[in-house]
């Protein structure tokens, strides 16, 4: 079932607006993909407008972490999700989004990609935090 993202049929007062056209296919959206930690990586391939595809990351175990000091990237295991600036409930539920702070085998990192839309988790290692962990 799609999520309708078009204009609402209610006025501010609560009354119904007059319907001047039908719903369009391009106004249909999808529910959010909540990427969480799991034993294996599971990706969902969705068809989007124009026949293109969007790869959604549903479950993951690893992240591509860039070390700014050496300018090298490594694929490392994610240990836990520490915090999410957008919504603290997402971190509590273990959902990885862009901007989330994660603990990896390489140290603390911040997610820079959008896992629900890119199909991969890219992160940048935090400078002062990586020496502590």
From Swiss-Prot:
GO MF annotations, alphabetized: structural constituent of ribosome
CDD domains in alphabetical order: Ribosomal_S8e
Region (Disordered): 1-31
Superkingdom assignment: Archaea
Pfam families per the UniProt record, alphabetical: Ribosomal_S8e
Swiss-Prot/TrEMBL keywords: Ribonucleoprotein, Ribosomal protein
A GO-annotated cellular component: cytosolic small ribosomal subunit
InterPro entries recorded: Ribosomal_eS8 (IPR001047), Ribosomal_eS8_CS (IPR018283), Ribosomal_protein_eS8_arc (IPR020919), Ribosomal_Se8/biogenesis_NSA2 (IPR022309)
Gene3D superfamilies: 2.40.10.310
Gene Ontology biological process: maturation of SSU-rRNA from tricistronic rRNA transcript (SSU-rRNA, 5.8S rRNA, LSU-rRNA); translation
Subunit comment: Part of the 30S ribosomal subunit.
NCBIfam families membership: eS8
Family: Belongs to the eukaryotic ribosomal protein eS8 family.
Protein name: Small ribosomal subunit protein eS8
